[in-house]
Amino acid sequence: MARGEQQRGEGGQRRDRRDRNAPEERVDSDIVEKLVHINRVAATVKGGRRFSFAALMVVGDQKGRVGFGHGKAREVPEAIRKATEEAKKTMIRVPLRESRTLHHDGAGRWGAGKVMMRAAPPGTGVIAGGPMRAVLETLGVQDVVAKSTGSSNPYNMVRATFEALKVQSSPRQIAAKRGKKVGDILGRRADGASAPEAIEG
């Protein structure tokens, strides 16, 4: 706890505004690590039950790259280490609009978990709960409105969030794919937030 308080103090005003109930956060060089969930797992073996811990971690550079990992071990620190290593190996790049929000609205699903995300104007903040907030903040999103329905399982919510992020496309990417100019794509985004053309592409 002391370490977290020290990081908030060194991080300045921006960190002071973060939700105190947010997942535990660690900073490793340029990579931010967040422990989303940890639970104890029991396996029945000959002679009794064997207990271990499963950790779900999210890592990112807060500049458009993010990944998640799941690790299991008999001790909590080892489970976190394994999950962190896996998360760093599976990082994806997501284009961000103005380095602060999504380029267009999106939705994702994994198992019984469903998420919906909407780009938002400056000053909105990250309006999302639990696992979704961890992913979006670690990615570097500063303004977004997100909602989850269905399963509240942290793993399903994280996977659903990643599925929604994978379909994000910048105007440049869409223009290249369709053989058009960037201006043609931007001209169809008069509302500045939602881009149906982008979602379809």
From Swiss-Prot:
GO terms for molecular function: rRNA binding; structural constituent of ribosome. Keywords: Ribonucleoprotein, Ribosomal protein, RNA-binding, rRNA-binding. It holds the Pfam family Ribosomal_S5_C. GO terms for cellular component: small ribosomal subunit. Residues 1-28, 173-201 are annotated as: Disordered. Residues 181-191 have a biased composition (Basic and acidic residues). InterPro entries: Ribosomal_Su5_D2-typ_SF, Ribosomal_uS5, Ribosomal_uS5_bac-type, Ribosomal_uS5_C, Ribosomal_uS5_N, Ribosomal_uS5_N_CS, Ribsml_uS5_D2-typ_fold_subgr. Residues 31-94 form the S5 DRBM domain. GO terms for biological process: translation. Belongs to the universal ribosomal protein uS5 family. NCBIfam families: rpsE_bact. The N-terminal domain interacts with the head of the 30S subunit; the C-terminal domain interacts with the body and contacts protein S4. The interaction surface between S4 and S5 is involved in control of translational fidelity. With S4 and S12 plays an important role in translational accuracy. PANTHER family: MITOCHONDRIAL RIBOSOMAL PROTEIN S5. Part of the 30S ribosomal subunit. Contacts proteins S4 and S8. This is Small ribosomal subunit protein uS5. It comes from Caulobacter vibrioides (strain NA1000 / CB15N) (Caulobacter crescentus). The lineage of its organism: Bacteria, Pseudomonadati, Pseudomonadota, Alphaproteobacteria, Caulobacterales.
